[in-house]
Curated annotation (Swiss-Prot):
Tree of life domain: Eukaryota
Biased composition (Low complexity): 76-101
Listed PROSITE patterns: ZN2_CY6_FUNGAL_1, ZN2_CY6_FUNGAL_2
Function: Transcription factor; part of the gene cluster that mediates the biosynthesis of sterigmatocystin (ST), a polyketide-derived furanocoumarin which is part of the most toxic and carcinogenic compounds among the known mycotoxins. Binds to the palindromic sequence 5'-TCG(N5)CGA-3'found in the promoter regions of several sterigmatocystin cluster genes to induce their expression.
Database matches in PANTHER family: MONODICTYPHENONE CLUSTER TRANSCRIPTION FACTOR-RELATED, OLEATE-ACTIVATED TRANSCRIPTION FACTOR 1-RELATED
Annotated DNA-binding residue span(s): 28-55
Primary localisation category: nucleus
Protein name, as recorded: Sterigmatocystin biosynthesis regulatory protein
Keywords carried by this UniProt record: DNA-binding, Metal-binding, Nucleus, Transcription, Transcription regulation, Zinc
Gene from which the chain derives: aflR
Annotated organism of origin: Emericella nidulans (strain FGSC A4 / ATCC 38163 / CBS 112.46 / NRRL 194 / M139) (Aspergillus nidulans)
Amino acid sequence: MEPPAISQQSTPTAPGGTQGTRKLRESCISCSRSKVKCNKEKPTCSRCVRRGLPCEYMVSRRTGRTRVIGVEQPKTAPSPTTPTNTTAATTATKAGPPVTTDSAVHTPVITTAPSPKPVQIQSPPAEPDLWGAILSPNTSTSTDLSSLLSVNTNFSQLFASLSPSLLEGMDGMDAEMHAPELGALSVADPSSSMMQGLEAPNAAQPPSSNTTSHSYCLSICLDTLMRLFPNAGANCERPGHESNPGKLFTIESVIEDNKQILDTAQTILACRCAEDEYVVTLVSLIVFKVLGWYVAAARDRSSDPGREEDFNWSTAQDSRRGSVSSFEEQVLHLPTVVGSYCIDGHHQSRMAAQLVLSELYRVQRLVTQVSRRLESIRRRSSSSSSSASSNTTDSDGGMSTPLSSTTLVHLEDDLRKRLRAVSSETISILRHA
């Protein structure tokens, strides 16, 4: 059987006057109607030969972007000066709604081959590679900058406040480009010391408060110790420091804060970080300061003349800045409600001392845990010192640990003495109330 004259249908005249080859369907009409695979032999497939069917290949309707022969400009020719009739001829061959000549005249030349280039802006390959190189751990830089890690601030909170401020200033395209990079910054590893210089000048700083998102015990100890000195900067005369009047705290706030602080210190002592003498020493200082706040809450200072007059009720500040030390525990002894107790009148001193005495068992439990940690450190220090002295011929008298065993023994003794003194004073207040 003779095949149909397909060549006449598949070689139409192009707009430029030259003939172009039009694409045929890969499957013939008979195989397409039967939903079977065609072997694509031209002019007649093997299936049509076996069945004696006419084999015809239709012109494909989904030709995509038709390449016009003879119209394509060389690479060196400038593209902005494309004629309007060429644009109209190119758009006429595209599948979709018909485009008139008037609309093509008023439309910029964006239908030619360079048109897909703006889409590539959404995923630039250079930016992610650049940020990946900066944020990836580098052995050469990590060793050089490891000494700066101890002074780094909270990077996760810094970039969490940094990312939204930058995202708000972007348009739609920039936000689509840089959103993955900013997301990587907000969750990047805080140990990367190179991130400390990435702060934007207009970024909002994290609010300064007593709480922090640091999760390691040493930082929690330092933050807790600063929390116990709320008026430390009241009398500071360092150049450039703006001192503020000291604040007073109620008995209720002292009791509640000390509960939280003692619970925090107990969790620190249960961690392996407490095997270090610095951490245990900081916990001991926290216990000393907590006992100071307890005894300040138990003492009756209602007889102090002018104490209530010097207190500013609107700002909760004490105007007697020069008369008291900024490191002294100052508790406001005024009628107040603590838990289910109402402290007022002649019952004030007795109820305050009774509340403090009922909380001292927490301190006793913490002092016992501190003593165990100090004893473990002393044993480890003595064993390391004995092994070092046996291995060296000349003894220079140096210590294997920063704090000697004698210092740790005195620290434990002072903790117990301070606890006994606060308990005795609180009991004395109860007896004379």
